[in-house]
A protein has these predicted regions:
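Condensing-enzyme catalytic core mediating Claisen C-C bond formation in acyl metabolism
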Residues: 1-22, 27, 124, 128-132, ...
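OB/S1-fold single-stranded nucleic-acid-binding modules
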Residues: 380-423, 453, 457, 464, ...
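Short aromatic-glycine-enriched beta-strand elements
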Residues: 425-438
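Conserved active-site "lid/cap" helical segment
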Residues: 1-82, 90, 149-160, 167, ...
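Beta-strand/loop nucleic-acid-binding surfaces
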Residues: 444-456
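Active-site-proximal alpha-helical scaffold in enzymes
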Residues: 78-109, 139-178, 217-222, 324-348
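Conserved catalytic cysteine-centered active-site region
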Residues: 1, 5, 50-104, 110-141, ...
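Short glycine/threonine-rich loop-to-helix capping motif typified by GTGT followed
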Residues: 51-58, 241-244, 277-300, 327, ...
Length: 499
């Protein structure tokens, strides 16, 4: 097995751009290969859904054609929003194995040609079918993870708001220093507090934007100044309700374990990191799952400023997905390129991290179900060199079996609310607001359902569940909701009779 190094890298500006997907991939690719002495012998493309976002298909061949390198093997890889990290991981394996010498990676997405509801609907296609048919979107599932995390670690509403606000303000500050970022302006506490709720408790400034952008990177077997020290990947259930824990990402923990093992490093060896902060709460959760902080204690370090650019462990000095932007297919590779910029001292003094020897990049595909962790290291770093991969025991993540479809039409049963959210920016075809919940039951274990009546719910509170017209609903067990439910059913029966 050979060591793998990073040669040239390039990235377009991220944002809502006039450029087409062809323009973006060509610009990033040409910039990357124009000054290299490496002969490219393979092309890997990362993109999540160019067919629907920008009406482009067969892009592995198209990009080879755009860059005038047709003739070499070209593949497109898709792992949802971690596609950029996926081509990096695969490229490392191909070079390490000796299959190729120099691989060009190009990752991109063009999303801004569609309205927000349409983009939300397309992104929701990575969600498990029953959850999606209930109206679930990525923000709503993220909100439920956040609520479960809040409950597990006994974080009150005010503290949770402070944690997420601090992360949002930090990442917007970092983005304001990044000339390639989608958002290049800072936000204030007032800006954050006054931003609209997307899916309770997530506000607009907790959510990453819809962005366009492209990235490119050359992996090589020839020694450069940055080597790949370790890489790990892990998957989890597509359905959120089937996971043993709703409050963290088991696949991040497993992917990180593999990357640390492969590199013979520990979390304490990492100098700075780019982590997947599609939602601000995820930055807090991810830094715990990656082993940087103890469970439930990341906020202590965040609020003390330890994750700022000048802190002891800078997190997302690029601005992260939150501020740099999130063109989904490009994001995973953008994180790696941002780390390379830092390691080569190619960023402004105000954005340069104090120690840039070893970096970790963490990318999430879907709602935490296809995750990559990559560790980069300066080749000059004085420690024993390690091979990219080592013998790792591949573990399976346990799950709770799906049981939503087992509920009979009009059957009623009781359970307790494990997590919930009220979604205000809904996917195309769903009315707003929409309350969604995950319910633990004795009979069917765990159910994903839609609230019949809007209102405030208590996590851990008793809930009644039933199926109607192939949709699973939940309601409170209170007398008021029972009366409303029977009144609704009687009115429906009367209307059905006259029809």
């Amino acid at each position: 097995m050979r060591e793998v190094y990073i040669d040239n890298v390039s990235m377009t500006k991220f944002g809502r751009l006039d450029s087409s997907l062809r323009d973006l991939t060509t610009k990033a690719g040409e910039e990357c290969i124009k000054n290299t002495d490496k002969k490219i012998d393979c092309l890997l493309i990362g993109a999540m859904n160019p067919e629907e976002f920008s009406s482009n298909s067969n892009i592995s061949s198209l990009v080879a054609d755009y860059l005038n390198i047709q003739g070499i093997p070209s593949l497109r890889i898709e792992t949802a929003s971690s596609s950029g990290a996926a081509i990096f991981s695969l490229g490392c394996s191909l070079i390490s194995s000796g299959a190729y010498e120099n691989i060009l990676l190009v990752a991109a997405e063009k999303m801004s040609g569609l309205d927000t509801q349409k983009v939300t609907k397309i992104l929701a296609k990575v969600i498990e079918e029953n959850e999606r048919l209930s109206g679930a979107s990525m923000p709503s599932l993220a909100a439920m993870v956040t609520m479960a995390y809040k409950l597990k670690y006994k974080i009150d509403k005010e503290l949770l708001n402070e944690i997420m606000r601090t992360i949002a303000i930090k990442n917007h500050h970092n983005g304001s220093l990044n000339p390639l970022a989608h958002f290049q302006k800072e936000i204030s506490e007032k800006d954050y507090n006054n931003s609209k709720i997307i899916s309770n408790p997530l506000k607009m400034y907790d959510c990453s934007p819809i962005s366009d952008g492209a990235t490119a990177l050359i992996l090589t077997s020839k020694k450069t100044d940055v080597r790949v020290s370790g890489s790990g990947q892990a998957t989890d259930t597509v359905s959120l309700k089937n996971r043993i824990s709703l409050s963290n990402f088991a696949a991040t923990r497993l992917a990180a374990k593999k990357a640390y093992t492969a590199s013979s490093l520990t979390p304490k060896d990492i100098n700075f990191a780019e982590v997947h902060d599609a939602f601000t709460s995820f930055e807090a959760i991810n830094t715990e799952d990656l082993g940087f902080f103890n469970e439930g204690e990341s906020y202590l370090h965040i609020l003390r400023g330890e994750t700022s650019i000048t802190g002891s462990l800078p997190i997302n000095p690029s601005g992260g997905l939150k501020s740099r932007g999130h063109p989904v297919g490009a994001t995973g590779l953008a994180q790696i390129i941002d780390c390379v910029y830092q390691m080569r001292n190619l960023v402004s003094h105000s954005r340069q991290v104090p120690n840039n020897q070893i970096a970790l990049c963490h990318s999430i595909g879907g709602m935490g179900n296809n995750i990559f962790v990559n560790i980069l290291e300066k080749a000059s770093n004085k420690r024993s060199k390690q091979l990219l991969t080592s013998k790792i025991n591949h573990e399976l993540i346990p799950k709770i079996n799906d049981s939503s479809e087992m509920i009979n039409e009009n059957e009623e049963l009781e359970g307790r609310l494990a997590s919930y959210t009220t979604l205000y920016v809904t996917p195309e075809g769903f009315d707003s607001p929409l309350t969604l919940g995950i319910i633990d039951t004795m009979k069917y274990k765990r159910i994903f359902a839609r609230a019949l009546f809007e209102g405030e719910f208590e996590i851990g509170g008793r809930i009644t569940i039933f199926r109607e017209n192939n949709i699973v609903y939940f309601r409170k067990t209170s007398y008021v909701d029972q009366i409303k439910f029977f009144a609704r059913r009687n009115i429906k029966n009367i209307l059905d009779f006259f029809e």
